[in-house]
Amino acid sequence: MDLRVIDKSDTELSIEIAGEDHTFMNVIKGALLETEGVTAATYDVNPEQSGGQTDPVLTIKTEEGVDALEALEDGTDAVIEKADNFTDAFEAAA
């Protein structure tokens, strides 16, 4: 997975995530929408200027005083925690 920051301000971040598809992008978007201080999280695989399918571009917008990059870190930590909890539950059930 390769990441490329496209645009960054204190309350907004657009980042290209190479090699990922809707499955991963929906998971990270969902976690971000549950993250405190995040006002919007979306992704696009067909930006208007691209002329077709591209690597997904994730865009995060946050409340004033909430750094968008830190919100992304919080969202990814939440995904990791959910995956770990699922693994533990699966192993306990097996």
Curated annotation (Swiss-Prot):
One of its GO terms (cellular component) is cytoplasm. It comes from Haloarcula marismortui (strain ATCC 43049 / DSM 3752 / JCM 8966 / VKM B-1809). One of its GO terms (molecular function) is DNA-directed RNA polymerase activity. This is DNA-directed RNA polymerase subunit Rpo11. Pfam families: RNA_pol_L_2. CDD domains: RNAP_L. Part of the RNA polymerase complex. The keyword Nucleotide-binding does not apply.
